[in-house]
Amino acid sequence: MSSRQDKEKSVNVQVLLRCRPFSDDEVRSNAPQVITCNDYQREVAVTQTIAGKQIDRVFTFDKVFGPTAKQRDLYDQAIIPIVNEVLEGFNCTIFAYGQTGTGKTYTMEGECRRAKASLRCCCSFIMCLPLPKGCLLFVFLSSKYLQSGPKGQLPADAGVIPRAVKQIFDTLESQNTEYSVKVTFLELYNEEITDLLAPEEISKAALEERQKKPLPLMEDGKGGVLVRGLEEEIVTNASEIFSLLERGSAKRRTAETLLNKQSSRSHSLFSITIHIKEATPEGEELIKCGKLNLVDLAGSENISRSGAREGRAREAGEINKSLLTLGRVITALVEHLGHVPYRDSKLTRLLRDSLGGRTKTCIIATVSPSVHCLEETLSTLDYAHRAKSIKNRPEVI
């Protein structure tokens, strides 16, 4: 049997566990540590006290990254092989899952929250200037991921998305092949899908009017879904993707809560589609099509502890509802139930092919080491541990 046939067999969802360091607030309050990570044995131990008795629980994952792990450690050990699969023609999904404030966006994007805050203030101003559309915006945005480190290198805190982009183009540009790359970027907020790459209007009033138009989610007739009207941008190099990523990320909804100073209030899905034209030894033309879905989920949230009120409480409720549905889908797949509730939320409809479908999937579960987050940490660990049993059947497109 060929290696290609081997790869098309069913494979388990890969689950990584990442525990962030203590936050400054947790250090100041001397919060007890309840999580111990053993990266070598791929284990996470949780210590809790019930009725005066100490109980330890141990969870095993495909890979474990403790508080001292660097962004590059996670990427080099776990993500490089996935991106290589995309370049071979597979569809792959990587998504971060966990409580709010545990480092999902940091893991996926890197330390760019301050840049985003500046972008939110500047984007509307820039788009109102009497310049060719996007002229100054591209210069302003494209610099962020290339500012630090040696020329052509990413900053040390760059996350999965910029590292994957760089790997893709480094590989494509080193090969003597024809290729094309397209990207999309969407946000799911309160069960409404919006295009984060939608063209902006010069008029400020029109900008506010059109910036957040919800898009319909449609069945594609093949068991998957598509988003009607989603802008697909053709890109020719990594810098262009970084520009689009910054532009879209600046529009994502965030808010300060008691648990997270810049909490994502929406789920986001950044997709990269690659077509590669190759010639076989017989002189025939072969086209490979791979797709990489990079998902940053909003964090599950204890509404009373986060201090959410009114509109923020509704946001948190919608986030928790969609994540609860995701948990039910995981349970149904693991227990081989007859009905899997994909259609109960738009999040699970979007992720349908990534959970029990034709896509190779990697879940990065993020947790806090603090006792104050113990309940949410155990929930994340339980669901992530169960997700290891989900089987997908990847196909080359």
Where do the PLM segments sit?
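Short, solvent-exposed loop/turn elements at domain surfaces
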Residues: 22-27, 194-195
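Conserved hydrophobic/aromatic beta-strand scaffold that supports enzyme active sites
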Residues: 16, 269-271, 363, 380
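Short acidic, low-complexity intrinsically disordered linear motifs used
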Residues: 10-22
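Conserved GTP-binding G-domain of TRAFAC-class P-loop NTPases and closely related GTPase folds
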Residues: 223, 227, 244, 359-361, ...
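P-loop NTPase motor catalytic core
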Residues: 2-12, 31, 40-354, 358, ...
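Intrinsically disordered, low-complexity acidic Ser/Thr-rich regulatory segments
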Residues: 1-3, 25-26
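A short beta-strand-to-loop transition that corresponds to the Sensor-1 phosphate-sensing loop
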Residues: 20, 187, 298, 366-369
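Extracellular/luminal ectodomains and secreted, surface-exposed scaffolds of diverse proteins
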Residues: 28, 33-35
